[in-house]
From Swiss-Prot:
Heterotetramer of 2 alpha/BCKDHA and 2 beta chains/BCKDHB that forms the branched-chain alpha-keto acid decarboxylase (E1) component of the BCKD complex. The branched-chain alpha-ketoacid dehydrogenase is a large complex composed of three major building blocks E1, E2 and E3. It is organized around E2, a 24-meric cubic core composed of DBT, to which are associated 6 to 12 copies of E1, and approximately 6 copies of the dehydrogenase E3, a DLD dimer. Interacts with PPM1K. The gene is BCKDHA. It comes from Pan troglodytes (Chimpanzee). The modification N6-acetyllysine is found at residue 356. Its cofactor is thiamine diphosphate; Mg(2+). It catalyses: N(6)-[(R)-lipoyl]-L-lysyl-[protein] + 3-methyl-2-oxobutanoate + H(+) = N(6)-[(R)-S(8)-2-methylpropanoyldihydrolipoyl]-L-lysyl-[protein] + CO2. This is 2-oxoisovalerate dehydrogenase subunit alpha, mitochondrial. Mg(2+) binds at residues 238, 267, 269.
């Protein structure tokens, strides 16, 4: 009986939070997410003996044994602004972005697409060691980035290059990082696509899944303590949401009331594992209410829906000091990485459908064409220009040498300890003796 009562109590609490999270604000000028901390109706009790006294939950008693079925709550709806033809569905949800901003969204997405194609092919030619494309997910990157303040701190996973692209991170630095040359801010110590930029408030990417989530919560808590008037946004995939760090991060953010946006890119696959084998519940957004986090599910291929949800979440996270969870539904058109062959676990027809029928770049292009802000001649000219820009940065990066091997020992301690100094001297002796066996001419002197 106690188990049934507890289950009913949790279900009713979650149902109330979920419904509150999904209601769009209807007052003039407001969009996106519902008001936080909905006021509950006070239940009347004839005596104190009837009133629940449990400190861990606030709920009513029931007198019938009833286990809560996992499918008793209908699926969380997907918020969208544009249909697949780029037409605004509900005029009241149109963000009315100026032409210049929409063009920046489009050019950031297409420039990222061009860079992906060139760097993917360069890996296949053996010019770089590894790469991960962003095909199909460009809208989640730039739509969210456009809604943030440039000083908001970003914790990425590994497929958020578009956020940096929107923040005008130079193509030369993208290329330098992938080549690991002397212009790489990380001095060639990281795998390709592990970008980071202090000036653009983008924390360097780390390979282990979900480690960035509790770290981002800590940064958000620090921002709150400092009254910094900024948010932290943390990106991750639906696969990473199954890691223990994700759940710890969600709970910390909720209990410490941190100004953070958890942005989940649900692209259908955790490497080769489809969502049908990852979870049995209603995706990732459904987990938010259980932690007391305001949540919403959006069409990740609709850049305006992503923009609206992120903008409203940011506004309220700063004003109310509370976390928000956005689940952006999208599709990973490319392979997981250059180490993956997705044809082993999904059909070509499936990939072609998303590439041809529901691509975020195509949807935004339809919108631009309908507004008279873009035409086929501009499209051809921009594609040619963007490829030229990427190729120039690519060729420049390829010509630059790798960092000096001595830099392996720097940036660890302010003053190098004796043991590390011995290792540095040992490497120098080894290279002096056997240098002809290494491509030292590729390294900076």
């Amino acid at each position: 009986m106690a188990v049934a009562i507890a289950a009913a109590r949790v279900w009713r609490l979650n149902r109330g939070l979920s419904q509150a999270a999904l209601l769009l604000l209807r007052r003039p000028g407001a969009r996106g997410l519902a008001r936080s901390h909905p006021r509950r109706q006070q239940q009347q009790f004839s005596s104190l003996d009837d009133k629940p006294q449990f400190p861990g939950a606030s709920a009513e008693f029931i007198d019938k044994l009833e286990f809560i079925q996992p499918n008793v709550i209908s699926g969380i709806p997907i918020y969208r602004v544009m249909d697949r033809q780029g037409q605004i569905i509900n005029p009241s949800e149109d963000p009315h972005l100026p032409k210049e901003k929409v063009l920046k969204l489009y050019k950031s997405m297409t420039l990222l697409n061009t860079m992906d194609r060139i760097l993917y092919e360069s890996q296949r030619q053996g010019r770089i060691s590894f790469y991960m494309t962003n095909y199909g997910e460009e809208g989640t990157h730039v739509g969210s980035a456009a809604a943030l303040d440039n000083t908001d701190l970003v914790f990425g996973q590994y497929r958020e290059a578009g956020v940096l692209m929107y923040r005008d991170y130079p193509l030369e630095l993208f290329m330098a990082q992938c080549y690991g040359n002397i212009s790489d801010l990380g001095k060639g110590r990281q795998m390709p696509v592990h970008y980071g930029c202090k000036e653009r408030h983008f924390v360097t990417i780390s390979s282990p899944l979900a480690t960035q989530i509790p770290q981002a919560v800590g940064a958000a808590y620090a921002a709150k303590r400092a009254n910094a008037n900024r948010v932290v946004i943390c990106y991750f995939g639906e696969g990473a949401a199954s890691e223990g760090d994700a759940h710890a991060g969600f709970n910390f953010a909720a209990t410490l009331e941190c100004p953070i946006i958890f942005f989940c890119r649900n692209n259908g696959y955790a490497i080769s594992t489809p969502t049908s084998e990852q979870y049995r519940g209603d995706g990732i957004a459904a987990r938010g209410p259980g932690y007391g986090i305001m949540s919403i599910r959006v069409d990740g291929n609709d850049v305006f829906a992503v923009y609206n949800a992120t903008k409203e979440a940011r506004r309220r996270a700063v004003a109310e000091n509370q976390p928000f969870l956005i689940e952006a539904m999208t599709y990973r058109i490319g392979h997981h990485s250059t180490s993956d062959d997705s044809s082993a676990y999904r059909s070509v027809d499936e990939v072609n459908y998303w590439d041809k029928q529901d691509h975020p770049v195509s949807r935004l292009r339809h919108y631009l064409l309908s507004q008279g802000w873009w035409d086929e001649e501009q499209e051809k000219a921009w594609r040619k220009q963007s490829r030229k820009k990427v190729m120039e940065a690519f060729e420049q990066a390829e010509r630059k040498p790798k960092p000096n091997p001595n830099l392996l020992f720097s940036d660890v301690y302010q003053e190098m300890p004796a043991q590390l100094r011995k290792q540095q001297e040992s490497l120098a002796r080894h290279l002096q003796t056997y240098g002809e066996h290494y491509p030292l001419d590729h390294f900076d002197k």
